[in-house]
Amino acid sequence: MLFLLSLKRIFIFRNHKFNIVGDVMGIEEEIRRIEEELKKTPYNKATQKHIGRLKAKLAKLREQAQSRGGGGGGKGYAVKKSGDATAAFVGFPSVGKSTLLNKLTNAKSEVGAYAFTTLTIVPGILEYKGAKIQLLDAPGIIVGASSGKGRGTEVLSAVRSADLILLTVDIYTLDHLPVLEKELYNVGIRLDQTPPDVKIKVKERGGINVSSTVPLTHIDEDTIEAILNEYRIHNADVVIREDITLEQFIDVVAGNRVYIPSLVVVNKIDLADEEYLKYIKQKLEEFGKDYILVSGNKGINLDLLKEKIYEKLGFIKIYLKPQGKKPDFDEPLIMRRGATVKDVCEKLHKDFVRNFRYAQVWGKSAKHPGQRVGLDHKLEDGDILTIVIKR
């Protein structure tokens, strides 16, 4: 009897697993069908609404494929964030990500002359100009990673929380760059973009009302309504303050996108001659992203890479001044550009926000020396800050 029950459980488990696989395969087939239809459909005023609906469907299907095919079981890739900011090396296998991590930090990421040496995400800390920057060496991804191939969904999901993406290739694999960008795009990572200035307020009745403060040249009201309907939103007020594209509007409606700056890191430049280096630079200019040429093995341009990472993360230094005392210029607080007094309070102690009375600021962000400000005050590099709390 026990043997029969065990067999039944195994059958149910396997059947459930086959259903999941079948669901994912069905979703992938539908994704391919829509992608083919989009390729064949010319984009014009007459087809804009139809294309908008198709792209909204495609975005929803990709989310379903990731959630169902994200690879259960086994060791996950979650890494606790530490330091002042996080930058993640993302690239195909064997481009030298582990070597770069080891050279820049105190980490020990395994290095090998074959693909897929790194099987988990390896963190390390880069200390530079007073900042502690967490660097992540992610396992190499492959084409189709965003659909779950090679546990790619888990890897890409883990880097969503990074503050900077280091698109890493070597001198022979520049053609990986658009592929990497596409795989990141498919999991909702928008490189070098800012969130569109669009507000959607869902309501109970009244239909779809669209208002814009600028002329819309890439999307019309019918397409906006079609996309919202695809997401089962039939009553909403939409306010648009920039000339957005159809894809940007879908991003706003989906609501799970992250916007992260990037830096292209081209490794192994010690293996290229002058002529080939010219070719590489030309290709990178065409790709249109900020880049740096390095060699992990030979240590070429690694100090410049540290500086680039620091600049891209937009750090500012805040000097704390206890009440009635002199500022501490020896150990500044490292914050990110756009940080507020509240951000500083949260970094210093969990009770500072709750017990906050006021703050005083000296520096670029102050209208006058010692200006009294609240939690929402934005700080600038080099500011001196006094925080006064309830006793």
Curated annotation (Swiss-Prot):
Keywords: GTP-binding, Nucleotide-binding. Residues 85-314 form the OBG-type G domain. Pfam families: MMR_HSR1, MMR_HSR1_Xtn, TGS. GTP binds at residues 91-98, 137-141, 267-270. Belongs to the TRAFAC class OBG-HflX-like GTPase superfamily. OBG GTPase family. The keyword Thylakoid does not apply. GO terms for biological process: cytoplasmic translation. SUPFAM superfamilies: P-loop containing nucleoside triphosphate hydrolases (SSF52540). GO terms for cellular component: cytoplasm. Residues 314-389 form the TGS domain. This is Uncharacterized GTP-binding protein MJ1326. GO terms for molecular function: GTP binding; GTPase activity. InterPro entries: Beta-grasp_dom_sf, DRG, G_OBG, GTP-bd, GTP-binding_2, GTP1-OBG_CS, P-loop_NTPase, Small_GTP-bd. PROSITE patterns: G_OBG, GTP1_OBG, TGS. It comes from the Archaea.
